[in-house]
């Protein structure tokens, strides 16, 4: 089923939940049993799709606003500026030492508080964060806000206060409508995020960038960080070895050796 083209952002306030993630390969710190988040950081690539979609919805509507909402350390602002350079209007970052070690339960609570305060018509999420790959945060936040949620959205339109999303499924597409305010997790197939222009990059630093503490949001210390988390990591380790393996180096006779190997085991 084809979805009609976008009508207009019509003064919509769009919040985009954007996570800042490590740029390099992931490593678990054996001391803290948490992801090592030192080193260079970048905007979660899946969230660039959500930013792009928000900018497309906003279009030329000067009355519409795209606000980035993020939970992470203060230095996340550097990476979030990429989304400002793409065209987002402002950033609200929840940065607080007490939030370190927050699991899904604590993170979704803090994000829901800031989103409640923003009161956006539409909350966009990426499909997943590429550091933890949970693909669950949107469900947890929507549940806390008691908002309808559509996930894996590959096309979306907003018209007359109703959002219509074409959702990718294993067997085809679902088309789902929901009244605003609504939460949507976009699929990475929805668009091709733009590159920030030089003008965008130059202008990004001047855009409003607000940092909030947990107390600014009225989040009690026992609902944040490890105290507010329900997950406990007991141990980390390497995956178990796969049993007996045989390595075949291809010196030109690799195919023959594989056939021989399979014949011996009566697999051919
Ligand atoms: C014991 C424990 C300790 C942890 N400590 C930390 C920690 O100190 N710091 C940390 O970052 N994570 C920490 N995590 C991981 C954290 O729980 C996950 O980041 C969280 O559950 C979200 O899952 P995800 O990152 O897989 O996001 P997904 O569910 O894959 O994210 C989906 C979408 O939600 C949005 N989103 C997700 N996270 C954020 C965010 N922070 N800000 C804005 N939008 C977001 C984005 O749009 C993203 O595309 C910890 C996990 C455990 C189990």
Regions found by a protein language model. Name each.
Residues 2-268:
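N-terminal glycine-rich FAD/FM-binding segment characteristic of electron-transfer flavoproteins
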């Amino acid at each position: 089923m084809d979805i009609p083209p976008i009508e207009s952002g019509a003064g919509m306030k769009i919040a985009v939940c954007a996570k800042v993630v490590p740029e390099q390969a992931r490593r678990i710190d054996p001391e803290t049993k948490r992801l090592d988040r030192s080193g260079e950081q970048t905007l979660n690539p899946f969230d660039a799709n959500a930013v792009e979609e928000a900018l497309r919805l906003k279009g030329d509507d000067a009355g519409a606003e795209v606000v980035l909402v993020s939970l992470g350390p203060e230095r996340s602002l550097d990476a979030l500026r990429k989304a400002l350079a793409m065209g987002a209007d402002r950033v609200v970052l929840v940065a607080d030492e007490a939030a370190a070690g927050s699991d899904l339960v604590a993170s979704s609570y803090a994000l829901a508080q800031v989103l409640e305060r923003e009161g956006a018509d539409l909350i966009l999420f990426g499909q997943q964060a590429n550091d933890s790959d949970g693909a669950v945060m949107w469900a947890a936040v929507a549940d806390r806000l008691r908002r309808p949620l559509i996930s894996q959205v590959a096309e979306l339109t907003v018209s007359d206060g109703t959002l219509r999303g074409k959702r990718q499924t294993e067997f085809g597409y679902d088309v789902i409508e929901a009244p605003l305010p609504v939460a949507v997790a976009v699929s990475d197939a929805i668009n091709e995020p733009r590159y920030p222009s030089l003008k965008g990059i130059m202008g990004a630093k001047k855009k409003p960038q607000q940092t909030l503490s947990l107390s600014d949001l009225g989040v009690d210390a026992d609902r944040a960080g490890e105290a507010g988390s329900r997950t406990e990591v007991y141990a980390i380790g390497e995956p178990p070895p796969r049993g007996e393996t045989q390595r075949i180096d291809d010196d030109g006779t690799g195919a023959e050796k594989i056939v021989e190997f399979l014949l011996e085991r009566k697999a051919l």
